[in-house]
Amino acid sequence: LDLKLSRAAAYQATVPVFGKGVIFDAPPDKMKAQLKIQVDALRYQNMKNYSTVISQEVDDWVAGWGDEGELDFLDEFLRLTLHTATHCLLGKDFRDRMTEEFRELYHALEKGLQAIAFVDPYMQQPVFEARDKALIRLQALIGGIIAERRASSHIEYGDALETFMAGTYTDGSRLTENEITGLVIATMFAGHHTSSGTATWTLTELARQKAYSAEVSEELQALFKIDSQITLESLREIPKLEAFIEEVLRLHPPLVLLMRRVIEDIDYNGTLIEAGKTVAISIYGSHRNTDYFPDPEKFDPYRPKPDTLFAYIPFGGGPHKCAGNAFAMMQMKAIFAALLPRYEFELVDPDVTYQDDLSAIVLKPTGPCRLRYTKRK
């Protein structure tokens, strides 16, 4: 069945965002090689550096909070996860020089992936014109970093950009500058675009679920001191936080659905699905299937995992599982391991106002998402 379905054809809306010849616009052999390089950039050795980087970003983020206050955390996590993704993927040198221009360019690319782009990503629309201009400028900015690094090739950076620059295809040729830039953007989308929504929902559910959040906070207080360094190894020792995040991912998965384009007629249980059609599965709906998740709207981090393969698919599954799933979980745990020992949180608005926004493929809460924070004694 997988041979009759195409990911690349279904996700052509990403081509003007990532650039020509990148991922879903690359020939199958090159796409496979690019995805392998992307996986290599998110392997254990690099993630050891990333956990410390994320902890440092959280330190900087909360430095001006004071003892108490209110914030729209949908907006706050958009900014924080852009900083963490940029720092991890492009390195400290770029993060230190990161300007408001970069943020605006990146968000222009994000807006280029709205639902209409999956109908025709090249129609005459102001949002698509802004997307195209943003890609050209981002290619120039990231290209400048690549040129600097090539001029000082003796320095080791330990970030994703270094891995992308060292990556090769099966014939030994290296990625072009625009292919490297496209991989950076694609990986940033994986590390930021979806993670900001997950982080917002995690903090919102922590404010909602007081009994569970108390258990999570106790676990973190026991393992970490505020001044202690958060490491990849220590992040493996917080099962209650991990279970909490996994339940957030069940109720509020990063993507509402996954799509494929049918490239050869399929007879599915007696129903003909013709070539050229787009098919989709709803992760949001699958995670509410009562056959696998009794009382599905109840938030329960300790609910038994279903025995059925692919009943729980926040990052997809099988050979096409999201390459950044381990990075995403590490990032969530690092953020909250650094944040929760410092502050406790509560909802500002009535509980029912915190809802999923199902109008886009990437799931986030309907904004604003206001929470009140108080510094722990």
Please tell me what each predicted stretch does:
Residues 1-16, 293-294, 307:
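Cytochrome P450 catalytic domain signature, combining two hallmark sequence patches
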Residues 8-90, 98-148, 165-167, 178, ...:
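Cytochrome P450 catalytic-domain helical core, especially the substrate-recognition surface
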Residues 44-47, 151-154, 232-239, 322-324, ...:
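Conserved, non-catalytic sequence blocks in retroelement Pol enzymes and Pol-derived host proteins
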Residues 81, 85, 135-145, 167-222, ...:
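Central I-helix of cytochrome P450 enzymes
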Residues 93-94, 111-117, 146-158, 173, ...:
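Proline-centered turn/helix-capping motifs that create local helix->coil transitions or kinks
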Residues 140, 144, 228-269, 290:
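Conserved cytochrome P450 K-helix E-x-x-R motif and the immediately C-terminal K′/meander segment
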Residues 210-212, 325-362:
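Cytochrome P450 heme-binding "Cys pocket" and the immediately downstream C-terminal segment
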Residues 281-306:
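Conserved cytochrome P450 K-helix/beta-meander segment immediately N-terminal to the heme-binding cysteine loop
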